[in-house]
């Protein structure tokens, strides 16, 4: 569906939720928002949640809307996993909270941003909750595609498919936000329509410089030795970025938790030590996911490079994404064939799939880099 159709479906659902005389089929207790990264599936789910608990049907200005979007409303729970999976214990606790009566609204709304990361046991536990819904509970699940959730869950939710906005639309949005046309056009092309990624590239000189370094690493491969060297450089960069982010967040989280458990000196009240161990476990899982997410983003950037090579090989230069590397791209295009370029793109996509299935990062990237030489 296009965005206009999705908005209309959600508007009808909000209207039906506020007026029992309207078509009851427009509103249901469980929804699945699907779409590729950058399609806005999570933003759409959160906006829908805000509209459901808004006294005005989603004005975007009231305290209910603002707190729901900020993730601080008592009747809207946003589940954002920073680990590799969502486990059954987390879902059991969530189901218990979801059954509580709304505090100030008509509904208690639960948004699960990464429903595709549910373990099988967690998904089965969630299925039971969806099969036996509370009168005032609404479940909003988000995933890349409908096939990323259990078939039994798919059959019990209403699915909405969102599409990635066009590059031109994203560039126009960035210009309206105050970025120059040059930066907006580049960021939109480089992000291939992913609004969040495009905004990040537009804002950050460091991000643009890091992206250029990644592409130059891919261009530097000439033999097996350089392939292994490039793989190590990419994985080391991912680990370094994850460590920087972890250091920034971990100590503050531990300090806040110790204060919450009443630590004085080296002593914690009963249960505090267990809570700290659980936090440290979650922080380790988050760091692992950050490494994989960084690598996945880097591989997507490298895909754009070989996409450009393929365009040049096909006789077209108008839609090149990495125009600042045109000379290097033309050199690669002249020395290779379209068939080999397609093989390289396939190797990158296989590596992305393997990383998503928890393959060892260094071995995965090494295998890919060897095929890019």
Predicted regions and their residues:
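Charged, glycine-rich active-site and insertion segments that engage polyanionic ligands
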Residues: 1-50, 67, 135-137, 144-298, ...
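Clamp-loader machinery-focused feature within the broader ASCE/P-loop NTPase space
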Residues: 1-121, 128-131
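Conserved D-loop beta-strand region of ABC ATPase nucleotide-binding domains
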Residues: 110, 140-143
């Amino acid at each position: 569906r296009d965005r206009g159709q999705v908005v209309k479906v959600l508007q009808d659902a909000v209207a039906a939720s506020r007026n029992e005389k309207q078509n009851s089929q427009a509103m249901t207790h469980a929804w699945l928002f699907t779409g590729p990264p950058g399609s806005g599936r999570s933003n759409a789910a959160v906006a829908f949640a805000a509209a459901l608990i808004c006294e005005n049907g989603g004005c975007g200005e009231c305290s209910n809307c603002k707190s729901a979007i900020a993730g601080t409303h008592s009747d809207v729970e946003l589940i954002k996993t920073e680990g590799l999976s969502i486990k059954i214990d987390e879902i059991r606790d969530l189901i218990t909270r979801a059954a509580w009566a709304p505090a100030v609204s008509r509904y208690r709304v639960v948004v699960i941003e990464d429903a595709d990361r549910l373990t099988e046991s967690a998904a089965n536990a969630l299925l039971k909750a969806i099969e036996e819904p509370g009168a005032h509970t609404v479940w909003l699940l988000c995933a890349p595609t409908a096939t990323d959730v259990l078939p039994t869950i798919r059959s019990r939710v209403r699915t909405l498919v969102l599409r990635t906005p066009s590059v031109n639309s994203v560039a126009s949005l960035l210009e309206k936000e105050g970025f120059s046309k040059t930066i907006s056009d580049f960021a939109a092309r480089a992000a291939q329509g992913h609004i969040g990624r495009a905004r990040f590239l537009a804002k950050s000189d460091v991000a643009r410089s890091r992206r250029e370094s990644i592409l130059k690493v891919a261009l530097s491969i000439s033999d097996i030795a350089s392939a292994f060297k490039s793989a190590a450089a990419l994985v080391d960069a991912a680990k370094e970025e994850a460590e920087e982010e972890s250091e920034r967040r971990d100590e503050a989280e531990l300090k806040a938790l110790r204060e919450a458990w009443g630590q004085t000196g080296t002593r914690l009240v009963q249960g505090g030590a267990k809570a700290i161990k659980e936090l440290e476990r979650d922080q380790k899982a988050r760091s692992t996911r950050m490494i994989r997410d960084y690598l996945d983003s880097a591989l997507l950037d490298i895909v754009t490079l070989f996409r450009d090579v393929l365009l040049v090989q096909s006789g077209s230069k108008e839609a090149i994404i990495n125009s600042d590397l045109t000379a290097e791209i033309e050199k690669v295009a002249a020395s290779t064939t379209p068939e080999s370029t397609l093989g390289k793109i396939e190797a990158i996509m296989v590596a992305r799939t393997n990383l998503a299935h928890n393959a060892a990062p260094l071995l995965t990237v090494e295998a890919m880099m060897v095929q890019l030489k």
